[in-house]
Amino acid sequence: MRIGHGFDVHKFGGEGPLVIGGVRIPYEKGLLAHSDGDVALHAATDALLGAAALGDIGKLFPDTDPAFKGADSRVLLREAWKRIRAKGYRLGNLDITIIAQAPKMAPHIPQMRVFLAEDLQCHMDDVNVKATTTEQLGFTGRGEGIACEAVALLIKE
């Protein structure tokens, strides 16, 4: 068994839609990023890559490469997962914590879990997503951006 941890943060201000966990969330602000800025999938991808000792999302999909400008993070997650599977790992579980004062994530979490299970070819019981605030403390509490942490357990087949 191998454990990986992922973390990502993006600042509000992007032109694009707000996408978290692969879900378009109605909100007046997007996130600034080279790709679609999906903090949940970026943290999840980093956790999975870390557990497999495959580096991180920036190594595989550098923000200096124009090919990844505006990239769909679900596509990046699936590509990372393909590489992890090629090393002989399967998912034990993935746990994601989204940290945001707004917008509220709870209505969107079920669909996030569906997308994660599809992309990782696993059961919904193997993926968990939850959200919290920082009680108006720090940059997320001031509504300046969104952060996310993820932990993944991989099992060698």
Swiss-Prot record:
Q: Which cofactor does it need?
A: a divalent metal cation
Cofactor, how bound (note): Binds 1 divalent metal cation per subunit.
| GO biological process, alphabetically ordered | isopentenyl diphosphate biosynthetic process, methylerythritol 4-phosphate pathway; terpenoid biosynthetic process
Give the record's keywords alphabetically: Isoprene biosynthesis, Lyase, Metal-binding
GO molecular-function terms, A-Z = 2-C-methyl-D-erythritol 2,4-cyclodiphosphate synthase activity; metal ion binding
One Pfam match, by short name?
Answer: YgbB
Lineage, broadest ranks: Bacteria, Pseudomonadati, Pseudomonadota, Gammaproteobacteria, Enterobacterales
Binding positions for 4-CDP-2-C-methyl-D-erythritol 2-phosphate per the UniProt entry: 8-10, 34-35, 56-58, 61-65, 100-106, 132-135, 139, 142
Please verify whether the record's keywords include Transmembrane helix: no
Query: Which NCBIfam families does the UniProt entry name for this protein?
Result: ispF
Query: Which HAMAP family does the record associate with it?
Result: IspF
Q: Which positions carry the signal peptide feature in this UniProt record?
A: none
Q: Which family is annotated? A: Belongs to the IspF family.
Which pathway does this chain act in?
Isoprenoid biosynthesis; isopentenyl diphosphate biosynthesis via DXP pathway; isopentenyl diphosphate from 1-deoxy-D-xylulose 5-phosphate: step 4/6
What does the record note on quaternary structure? Answer: Homotrimer.
Instruction: Name the encoding gene, please.
Output: ispF
Annotated positions for site Transition state stabilizer: H34, T133
PROSITE patterns the UniProt entry points to: ISPF (PS01350)
NADP listed as a keyword: no
Binding residue positions for a divalent metal cation: D8, H10, H42
Q: Which InterPro entries match?
A: MECDP_synthase, MECDP_synthase_CS, MECDP_synthase_sf
Protein name per UniProt: 2-C-methyl-D-erythritol 2,4-cyclodiphosphate synthase
Give the enzyme's EC designation: 4.6.1.12
List the catalytic activities from the record.
Answer: 4-CDP-2-C-methyl-D-erythritol 2-phosphate = 2-C-methyl-D-erythritol 2,4-cyclic diphosphate + CMP
Q: State its role.
A: Involved in the biosynthesis of isopentenyl diphosphate (IPP) and dimethylallyl diphosphate (DMAPP), two major building blocks of isoprenoid compounds. Catalyzes the conversion of 4-diphosphocytidyl-2-C-methyl-D-erythritol 2-phosphate (CDP-ME2P) to 2-C-methyl-D-erythritol 2,4-cyclodiphosphate (ME-CPP) with a corresponding release of cytidine 5-monophosphate (CMP).
